[in-house]
Amino acid sequence: KKQVVLTVERDGTTADITVSLEKVEVTVVKSRMLDDSLGYIQITEFTDGTSEQFKKAYSELNEQGMKGLLVDLRENPGGLLTAVCDTLEQILPKGMIVYTEDKSGHRTEHTCKGKTPIDIPLVVLVNENSASAAEIFSGAVKDHGVGTLVGTTTFGKGIVQQTFSLGDGSAVKLTTSRYYTPNGVNIQGTGITPDVESDWPENAEEFTNPNQ
């Protein structure tokens, strides 16, 4: 393990403290069973650890007899494109997840192998602060028809931005491309309209009822 030495000054004296550096993984996925058959997974952000955390939560809920799943993306600001694609790989059928296109028309596709498509009712909760990667997740679920979106229209961030370092130590962030849902929809400035609009979707459980 790498170590750093911190020098601390207190009451006119100094002391060196050796600290070991470790990777800290923030919990961005929380899950629980809402009742005997309905599972709930909240994703707060799409980071390097999201896919594995989702996989673990999804597996544990299945072991507990889950027959319907509620994925909560409300207040999720987005995150890494790779993270949302790896997460969707676990539930989508074979096909497009999302594609990006730059100003020259160069297109980059991100697809799903479809080895483990979800086979239970799925509801995705969204609101006006669900953005970027959260909208990629929502758009893919909606376009593939594997789940129902419930909530309010999402933020509407359908662009890809990159940060470029400058010689003086500063940096500039530029829009380099736009992303599109599997059906070719760019949601920049418009967002994704849910299938069921509700400010506080307290009744979302009914949309995952396997008996309906």
Regions picked out by a protein language model, each given a short descriptive name:
Residues I41, V172-L174, I187:
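Short hydrophobic-aromatic micro-motifs
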Residues L166-S177:
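Short acidic, Pro/Gly- and aromatic-enriched capping/linker segments at domain boundaries
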Residues G189-Q212:
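Conserved helicase C-terminal RecA-like lobe
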Residues T181:
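Short, acidic, Ser/Thr-enriched surface-loop or helix-capping motifs
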Residues A15, I187-Q188:
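Generic structural signal for well-ordered beta-strand positions
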Residues K1-K157, Q161-F164:
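Cleft-lining beta-strand/loop regions that shape enzyme active-site pockets
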